[in-house]
Amino acid sequence: VELRLGDPLDSDFDRKLAQLVPDGRPGRGITRDRRHMLIGLPRVDSVSSNQDLGEAISAAAASMRQRSSAEAPKVRMLPHKIDYAALVPQASQSDQPNLRILVGINETELAPTFLEFGDQPHMMIFGDSECGKTGLLRTMCREIVRTTTPEQVQLFIVDYRRTLLGVVETEHLAKYAMSSNTLVDEVPALIELLKSRMPGPDVTQQELRDRSWWSGPEIYILVDDYDLVALASGNPLLPLTEYLPHSKDIGLHVVIARRTSGASRAMFEPMMARMKDLSCIGLQMSGNKDEGVLLGTVRPSEQPPGRGTLVMRSGGQQLIQVAWSDPR
């Protein structure tokens, strides 16, 4: 429907007909099939005034409740906070815990939501300050520790702000880089490991299918505040870029989290550009809509902490609430 417009020339239905909609008559307008219409007041007391409309609506609702005992089912909404410990018992066991990670619940079914790294090996997370990016990485770390052994998964954490310090205290933690100097020192050994997993000319087709020419854990590189790592002066993680397309073969998973502000420009940075080209998992949390579309068809918007739109090949786009776990 289309109500009275300030300028009939703005009508999407019929400009001439829009000129005939009287001014000062609330509820008058036109329909898409070019008919005049009048919207009725939402009251049942035969009063044609909008005075005390709120009270009249409440009285009408009370009257209807008295006539019938039936009630409409309550609309289930995403909670503003869900504890990771409370969510764990609801999650089904996975036969590939090193590739399927529980992170929260979705809006459609209010059911546990998993990141499917077996289908899409990498992930990008966008969100502004205090939106829950670090909370998501913390939940991922704790879920990996809960469901896997150090022989199945090794974590390489890049955390310049030290917000993930102490989250992983088991042998799952391979390296913890808290500064650029530390990261520069650790990357060469990581690159050598990945290089050793690349299939050589003597690898058979059967070995390629089974991924049996090497053995070892899946490697997860979790990077918080990626905008502090990838600077104009250089990016210590840049050597990883050439291995990203081979991630399923060599057991590599890169998860980067950065602020939404400035992300539209940062998408041209080599590593982020390659991850986007490879159709990685994406989570768009709270951010300024002026940044434009960064993941799928999702435009940033204001969201409560922990809330975001998850973009995955298997599940399309869905709103989720990330499970919260205490920093300590």
Predicted feature locations:
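Phosphate-binding and hydrolysis-coupling loops of NTP-dependent motor/remodeling domains
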Residues: 1-107, 112-114, 257, 264-328
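P-loop NTPase catalytic phosphate-binding loop
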Residues: 1-2, 6, 94-280, 287
